[in-house]
Amino acid sequence: MKSATLLALSFLLIASCFLICEAEHSRYEEHEILEENMGDVVNLEQRSCAKPGEMCMRIKCCDGQCGCNRGTGRCFCK
């Protein structure tokens, strides 16, 4: 009985670690995309939005992807 309890607790610990890591990774990726949208002058044409329908340079994106005009820096829906 003790070994079954220990095995179950080990499984729960591993599962919770996996879920925590997965949650942190998705937030980190979203943060990176938002940071890219805020001031990456080098990659203006390759900016993307973290979530569909999000604002990119104050312009709402259509499908989660937006492009940026080199001259003005304003984004448009792709």
UniProtKB/Swiss-Prot annotation:
The keyword Nuclease does not apply. GO terms for molecular function: ion channel regulator activity; toxin activity. Residues 1-23 form the signal peptide. Residues 24-47 form a propeptide. It comes from Cyriopagopus hainanus (Chinese bird spider). The presence of a 'disulfide through disulfide knot' structurally defines this protein as a knottin. This is Hainantoxin-XX.3. Its main location: secreted. Belongs to the hainantoxin family. 20 subfamily. It is found in: Secreted. Putative ion channel inhibitor. Disulfide bonds join 49-62, 56-66, 61-77. It comes from the Eukaryota. Keywords: Disulfide bond, Ion channel impairing toxin, Knottin, Secreted, Signal, Toxin. GO terms for cellular component: extracellular region. Expressed by the venom gland.
